[in-house]
Amino acid sequence: MVYFGKTLNRDNMEDSVKMSDIDGLGMKPANLDWANMGFGYVATRSHVRMTWMDGRWSEPELINEPYIKMSIAATCLHYGQEAFEGLKAFRCKDGKVRVFRPWENIRRMNNTADYILMPQVPEELYLKCIQMVVRDNQDYVPPYGTGGSLYIRPLLIGTGAQIGVSPAKMFDFIILVTPVGAYYKGGLTPVEALVITDFDRAAPRGTGHIKVGGNYAASLLPSKKAKEQHYPITLFLDPETHTYIDEFGTSNFFAINKDN
C-alpha cells in the first residue's frame, strides 16, 4: 500500500512532499498518453517478489510499494551479484495480452545465475511470477496499434549480508513492469552509430556472455561520449581482435549482405 503520512521510513518526509513527486507514483492508466509514450519508468500497481533462503524459494507475493529493504552489506550492492532480464507483453488485435518468448528469458537468467553462484528460479515458478504481475497490471498494457508494450523486468539479487567476497545466503527474485513506447521513436528510420574502438563492451572470459548489470554500467561512459558527438547509439567491436562487429550498445547486430 502506498502511504502518504509522516512515518514513511524515507527520512521522515513531510506531508507536503508527495511520494509521487519523487518516484513517479500515482500515474493511472487512464491518464497515460499511449500515443506518445517514451521508454522510461512509470510506476504501476504492483511488482512480484519472493525470497530464497535455506535452499528453497518462498511463495511469490504481489507488493504495492516500489521499494526494497535489504542489508547495507548485501552482495548485490558490493560485489554485483545480480542478474536481470527484459521481455515484453503486448495487447493483440483480439484484445488478449501475450508475453513474447518468456522461456528464452527464463533460461538465460538461470544460465547467468549458475555463472555467478545464485540459485536458479524453477521455470514454472518463474512463469507463474510473470503471469501474476502481468495479470495484476494488465490495464497498463498499451492498446493494440499504439506500438507500445508492457516492459517486464525480472531481477535476481543477492540480499544476504556478506563482507568477504563470497556468495550470499539469501536472494530476492523480483519482477517489475512498466508501460513503454518504442525504444526508437523513429521506428525503422536509419540512425548513425559511433563505432567504439577504445573500449570493450564485454570481457570474453568474464561476464560478457551473461546478463549482469556491471556489463551495462561499464558501457555508460562510451555511450555518453557518443551522444556528445550526436550519435544516438554505439557499435562495439569484438574484444579479442577489435576487427569484427560485436553488437550495439542497446541491441544485437544483424546484417543483410545480399539483396533478394
Could you describe each region identified by the protein language model?
Residues V2-C129, V133, Q162-N260:
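Helix-start/capping segments and mature chain N-termini
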Residues L125, Q138-D139:
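Compact soluble domain cores
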Residues D136, G158-T159:
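Intrinsically disordered, low-complexity linker/loop segments enriched in Gly/Pro
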Residues Y140-G145, V165-P167:
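Short, charge-rich binding segments
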Residues P142-R153, I157:
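Extended, Lys/Arg-enriched charged tracts that mediate electrostatic binding to polyanionic substrates
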